[in-house]
């Protein structure tokens, strides 16, 4: 069903059983998959490819030009997976040619009211972005991450899978997998034990991750000192391997 007040470009590709409510605008080069719902006043622009079963609440702006002064009108892209929910007033921008020209959103994510995801971000699956989260350009977010309300993430930061930020957190460095941070100075607060339990991690795996956390944050080690210890632990603990590899590959440095 497409409401008569909505404007749909002739070049847009609209899938089966898509519901487009009043006063929506679908621009050129947009592709919307089957069973999506645009409630009302939703704008989708640019080279935006949207998967199946996504729901966009009113006043979402999807695939708009990036907020980067270097942007000069180049063709850039947005890809969104399946089964995502974008609540009221979410903004998701396309990429830039300075990166890979692509912003990519995975599947089964929940973007609560007024979330902003900037150009060139890569977001995985099953994440929750609480109200008023702002994610700056080039940020990479793993899977099953929870960003508390009003979290702000600096450009180029990476946030590992299963991480958690408290409400109002300001993230200026990389957040390793499993780690919780809070406050305006992104202070580590331990591992996301409750979240790991809910996701089926065994008690022994959680204990191994806790031991690895202590190596990084509680034993007085620098990152360089912690890495050999983590690598040794990772030989028998796959979940610690994920943590060790993340820390080793961090370009901005990890939260401390």
Please place each PLM-identified region on the residue numbering.
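Structural signal for interior beta-strand "rungs" in well-ordered beta-sheet cores
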Residues: 1-182, 186-187
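Terminal amphipathic alpha-helical/low-complexity segments used for targeting or macromolecular assembly
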Residues: 1-5, 10-11, 16-17, 53, ...
């Amino acid at each position: 069903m497409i409401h008569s007040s909505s404007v749909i470009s002739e070049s847009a590709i609209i899938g089966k059983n898509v519901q487009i409510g009043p006063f929506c605008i679908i621009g050129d080069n947009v592709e919307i998959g089957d069973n999506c719902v645009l409630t009302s006043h939703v704008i989708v622009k640019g080279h935006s490819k949207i998967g199946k079963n996504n729901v966009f609440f009113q006043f979402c702006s999807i695939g708009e030009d990036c907020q980067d002064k270097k942007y000069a009108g180049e063709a850039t892209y947005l890809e969104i997976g399946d089964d995502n929910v974008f609540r009221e007033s979410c903004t998701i921008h396309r990429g830039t040619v300075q990166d890979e020209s692509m912003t990519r959103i995975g599947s089964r994510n929940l973007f609560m009211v007024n979330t902003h995801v900037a150009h060139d971000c890569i977001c995985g699956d099953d994440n929750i972005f609480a109200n008023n989260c702002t994610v700056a350009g080039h940020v990479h977010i793993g899977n099953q991450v929870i960003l508390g309300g009003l979290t702000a993430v600096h450009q180029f930061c990476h946030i590992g899978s299963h991480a958690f930020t408290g409400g109002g957190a300001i993230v200026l460095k990389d957040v390793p997998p499993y780690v919780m941070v809070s406050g305006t100075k992104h202070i580590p607060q331990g591992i996301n034990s409750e979240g790991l339990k809910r996701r089926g991690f065994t008690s022994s795996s959680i204990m191994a991750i806790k031991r690895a956390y202590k190596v990084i944050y509680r034993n007085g080690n620098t990152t360089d000192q912690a890495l050999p210890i983590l690598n040794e632990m990772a030989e028998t603990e796959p979940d610690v391997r994920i943590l060790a590899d993340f820390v080793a590959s961090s370009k901005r440095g990890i939260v401390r």
